[in-house]
Amino acid sequence: MKRVGASLVSLAVFVIAWKLVTVVGSMPEYILPAPEVVAERGVRAIGSGVLWEHAGVTLVEIVLGFAAGASLAVMTGIALGKSVLVERVLSPYIVAAQAVPILALAPLLDIWFGGGLLARVAICALIVFFPIAIATMVGIRSADPLLDEMLRSLGAGPAKRTRLLEIPSALPVIFGGLRVGVTLAVIGAVVAEWAGAGSGLGVLINIANQGLFDTPLMFVALAALAIIGLAFHGLVVLAERRLVIR
């Protein structure tokens, strides 16, 4: 309850500060709309179904992209953590892919995957992959060597040691990567939509900004993205609390 109360207080302070800026600075609506203007535009967007339509598309992209990227990242991270040879072979490619801006790669991936949902999921998965893979690798290598030696002496093979020791030991670090990855999934979905999509919150932002000159609608789309990001981050934190033994 204390956390919820603190969050509500910080939200209230943010909204009040936002309102003061618009009043004191005499900001025109097309530059910085007042909170009540954005709220009213949000109600209209929800009532007309526009927000639901675009948010639904983005949600699907985030869920599929995060699931694909996180699954592949965890498996790759385990392999990297257990084998120095695998790390030496794969690390240059992983780092190189991460070093290239996703905005530059997105149009190319859109072409390779033929556009559509598959392309956007691939872009989202790529941006999610790196932090989770690295976190998993670090976590796997943090397993207690004494416990590992004890399991070896009891006849446990590599797979059993991974299941009983390395993965449980790595979970706190893996979940740290998942927290970062799930927020990056939201960014990845928007970037993917900018690369080529007919709907989604990223598309709605472009329509509001460039087509309709509707700044309040753009703020509504941004707020929806923030809420989605917070919700998914909260789910990861909840899963962490249930699965990680402190």
At which residue positions do the language-model features occur?
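N-terminal signal-anchor transmembrane alpha helix
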Residues: 2-26
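Periplasmic/extracellular loop-to-transmembrane helix junction in inner-membrane transport proteins
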Residues: 23-67, 207
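Transmembrane-helix boundary motif in ABC transporter permease subunits
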Residues: 64-94, 111
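C-terminal transmembrane helix and the adjacent membrane-cytosol boundary/short C-terminal tail
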Residues: 84, 141, 172, 219-246
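Generic hydrophobic transmembrane alpha-helix motif, especially the helices
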Residues: 95-131, 138-139
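Glycine-rich helix-loop "coupling/hinge" segments at transmembrane-helix boundaries
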Residues: 111, 140, 187-225, 244
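Transmembrane alpha-helices
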Residues: 122-126, 159-192
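Short helix-to-coil transition segments within interhelical loops
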Residues: 140-146, 150-170, 211
